[in-house]
Amino acid sequence: MRTGLLASFLFAIAGTFDGVRRYHDQFREVNKWNLLSGWPVVGDCLEFLGGFVAWLQGTPLPSYDWWGPSRVNTGNFDITEFPFFTFLFGDLHPHLMGIPIFTLLIALSMAYVFSCQEGRFTHSVVLAAMLGLSIAISKMTNTWDMPTLCLVAVIAFVFGSTTFKVKGLSSTHNNLLSESILWLVASASVALGAFVSGLGWVAAIFAIFALTTGVSIFASVELRLRLLIFVRHLIISLLTFMIFVIPYDEARETFDLSLRRTSWVSPFSDFLSHWGVFFFIALAFICHEVHQRLSGRSVKSIFHVRHSHSKCDVLNFWLFVIYALVAFSLGLLIGWALALSAFGAAVVVHLLTLEMLGTRSIQKIGALCLWALGFAILAGPEIFVVSNDVERMNTVFKFWLQGWTLLAL
């Protein structure tokens, strides 16, 4: 209950540190002190204090720039709205209408994984169809969200099939090998036909189906069943998606949806003012995880490599060093916003891997997946931009909103 309320607050009510910067700028404008002016941190504090004293003495403050937090990146046209600002602004644009659909699909994905854990055949099939329907609605409402939601759904199908409670189903599937061969032939035929017809995405999707079912032929009975569950549910979701989207696609028109290398990056101070809350929470979480894994052990014992667990600790340590060096290089070559996002994504993926090899808590795995995807989305606009965008305006706008949703939840 408390976790849900906190997630709701971070998602729908919380703001950014940029509001604090705006108030600081107001007081700095009326500051009359010149002591240590221009000094970092100390000078900023004295400027604020001087402005506060001037305000107490009756000097009026400049008007608050309420529009500023939605344009936090200086020197470009990036739109940096966050959900609370969007709700206050109240303009019924696709990004606002897409927010409940985005959160709905995340909730459905979690429900799907839990139903698979309990071996609920009917529930999992219905939820797979609802995932396809939600993605179709997202495409018709706010197309920017669809690639991310497709990735979330695929991750859910992977975890659902790998954790499915198969004991209750094994007795009802006595001819899995024949089913695998049937799916292989059907998928390969559709993939070949789509490739000849120039339907690249359809060919790629069914080629993946053919590859998956081909592997299942040579797998153990349990693994074959899990791979078939993945294929079945993914096809159910895809068919549901196509039933609703095909009529829509016949009446829509798009222009040059490719990606290109961006020429702009987020100023690091502006980036931190917007995302500082979430990075602070992420840092606290990572420190807690590291403390739990090293509880009761000295730093010296970590590098005592005569035991297997110590060797794993040494490997983990050097991997973290590599992540830091790669992030530092990205910061020097491209920008520190990309460096911090990439480092966060790498560390969270590392913790996700350790969790999957260890206790395999679905709750923690789900949270780590949301963190990893959120950091990856923040890194994306620092490298690529959608073609025909005005600089990075809408690319940052739409993907930062997605990142906020994922990190908050």
Language-model regions, residue ranges each:
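Specific aromatic-rich, kink-prone transmembrane helix
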Residues: 56, 60-73, 80-82, 98-117, ...
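Hydrophobic transmembrane alpha-helices of multi-pass, membrane-embedded glycosylation machinery
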Residues: 150-159, 207-216, 344-350, 409
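Membrane-interfacial loop-to-transmembrane alpha-helix junctions, especially the N-terminal start
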Residues: 3, 119-128, 175-184, 223-240, ...
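Membrane-interface alpha helices of multi-pass inner-membrane proteins
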Residues: 86-89, 128-141, 187-197, 326-329
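Hydrophobic/aromatic-rich transmembrane helices and adjacent perimembrane loops
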Residues: 149, 393-409
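Aromatic-rich transmembrane-lumenal/periplasmic boundary elements in polytopic membrane proteins
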Residues: 2-88, 259
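Membrane-interface transmembrane helices that cradle and orient dolichyl/undecaprenyl
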Residues: 105-125, 155-182, 210-219
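Juxtamembrane "helix-exit" motif on the non-cytosolic side of transmembrane helices
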Residues: 248-254, 330, 381-389
